[in-house]
Regions:
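A short, solvent-exposed loop/turn motif at the edges and junctions
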Residues: 245-272
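Short, acidic Ser/Thr/Gly-rich low-complexity loop/linker segments typical of extracellular
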Residues: 224-242
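Extracellular beta-sheet/turn segments enriched in Thr/Pro/Gly and aliphatic residues
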Residues: 267-294, 298
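Periplasmic OmpA-like peptidoglycan-binding domain that tethers envelope proteins to the cell wall
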Residues: 337-409
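Structural motif
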Residues: 204-216, 221-223
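Periplasmic peptidoglycan-binding/anchoring modules of Gram-negative envelope and division proteins
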Residues: 302-336, 364, 404-409
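Acidic, Ser/Thr/Pro-rich low-complexity intrinsically disordered segments
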Residues: 20-31, 60-174, 180-185, 194-197, ...
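A short, Gly/Thr-enriched small/hydrophobic beta-strand-prone motif that recurs across taxa
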Residues: 91-93, 195-208, 294-299
């Protein structure tokens, strides 16, 4: 009954939102040290385990193995067993993150293809599909798991890679995951799953005014973290590009273009679908660096009622800095904008000026001469989305922005 109630709790949390964390209490964790008592989890949310497992339970399912085995622990020490059904057809990854970074967590991942998995395990009839028994790495916060960039399915003990290779899974496949805190301890850990799809994006890069082809460096970047996912170049004659990349399901990405004598561009790739591999075809027109040309920085946004920029703005800021560093004669006007004027025009004017000045100060701090920079606020007079009553959160964020105008080049 306790296991059924715990599973229902997880289902309720799932329907409240995929981003919600699920907390697993110490009692539940300590009752799951055997395969037969594995906790059934939803491998979508972030799972927070308040305590580490204590002991190996009533049965020592994994034992008498060689310390050099790439498949198994030598024996269980302090284990917790989890089981789950895969929600997608995808490449599955996960991170096991200890609260105390001195802890050494190992894991084995089994695919359950028979009805009596735990019994077969006791008779050594089951081999894991992934394992990582490496020594913890304090420099990497002792994290382990499956990673999209890892190369090996099985990692033995000793000083070895922290991640094992991502696993291709199909929806509704059933898996058992056993996690072992080798040397013990009370502090807990978190478990975060992510799922990747193979994606393709192709298109053409052109001059905004002449439609002529542009040779450009092309980058796929996570909209959440700014992490670079893939990189390629467009054809110097046709401007065409074709790029494969692996995208996390339910995350957005930016396609970035960087071309000589042109502004960079940032194109949002819509929320990643859960369907099979798909291809996106884009036509991107980029403005040339010339007097009176304007660039809208859709990713350089601010917190509401604040001139503090969002963390997601940092990659755009760095691109703007590189643009100024690589074009020493470029002089720009930084325009600040607000989402409406709820505090009045005077307050909105001050806020928009502060936003523009924040970007100017960032560039000066990083070596751009102040003589090349002018900042100005435009209050709420140039909102991209002026309908305040119906604006979505995304549209409101787009209004809280800066734009760049070329004064001289």
């Amino acid at each position: 009954m306790k296991k059924i109630w715990f599973f229902l709790t997880i289902l309720l949390a799932y329907f409240h939102g995929l981003s919600q964390n699920i907390i697993i209490d110490c009692i539940t964790s300590k009752q799951a040290s055997d395969c037969y008592s594995a906790i059934e989890i939803n491998p979508v949310n972030k799972l927070l385990f308040n305590c580490s497992p204590q002991g190996f339970g009533s049965q020592l399912e994994i034992k008498n193995n060689s310390p050099k085995s790439i498949f198994f622990f030598e024996k269980e020490h302090n284990t917790i067993w989890l089981k789950f059904n895969c929600p997608y057809d995808a490449l599955m990854c996960f991170d096991i993150i200890p609260i105390d970074t001195t802890y050494d967590f190992d894991f084995l991942l089994f695919k359950n293809e028979e009805n009596d998995f735990c019994k077969n395990l006791n008779y050594n009839h089951e081999k894991p599909v992934r394992s990582n028994i490496s020594r913890n790495n304090l420099k990497n916060k002792s994290i382990t798991g499956l990673n999209i960039n890892a190369k090996k399915k099985y990692i033995p003990s000793g000083i070895q890679p922290m991640y094992s290779k991502a696993l291709k899974v199909n929806k509704s496949e059933n898996y058992f995951l056993v996690i072992d805190n080798v040397y013990g301890g009370e502090s807990g850990f978190s478990l975060q799953f992510s799922y990747y799809k193979e994606k393709n994006i192709k298109g053409k890069i052109m001059d905004k005014n002449t439609n002529s082809a542009i040779y450009s460096n092309i980058i796929i970047e996570s909209a959440n973290s700014g992490e670079q996912i893939a990189e390629s170049q467009s054809d110097s004659v046709t401007g065409e590009f074709n790029l494969d990349y692996k995208a996390i399901i339910n995350e957005d990405y930016y396609l970035i273009t960087e071309s000589k004598n042109y502004f960079f561009s940032e194109t949002l790739i819509n929320t990643i679908s859960k369907t099979d591999t798909f291809s996106t075809n884009l036509e991107i027109k980029v403005p040339k660096l010339k007097k009176n040309e304007n660039l809208k920085l859709h990713n350089l946004n601010f917190y509401g009622d604040s001139y503090e920029y969002l963390p997601t703005a940092i990659p755009s800021l760095n691109r703007l800095l590189s643009l100024m560093q690589n074009n020493s004669t470029l002089k720009i006007l930084i325009e600040g904008h607000t989402n409406g004027c709820p505090g009045g025009i005077e307050y909105s004017q001050m806020l928009s000026e502060q936003r523009a000045k924040t970007i100017k100060d960032f560039l000066i701090k990083n070596g751009v001469k102040k003589q090349r920079l002018v900042s100005k606020g435009f209050n709420c007079s140039k909102m991209l989305y002026p309908n305040m009553e119906t604006n979505s959160d995304w549209e409101k964020m787009m209004n809280r922005r800066v734009e760049i105008l070329v004064l001289d080049f």
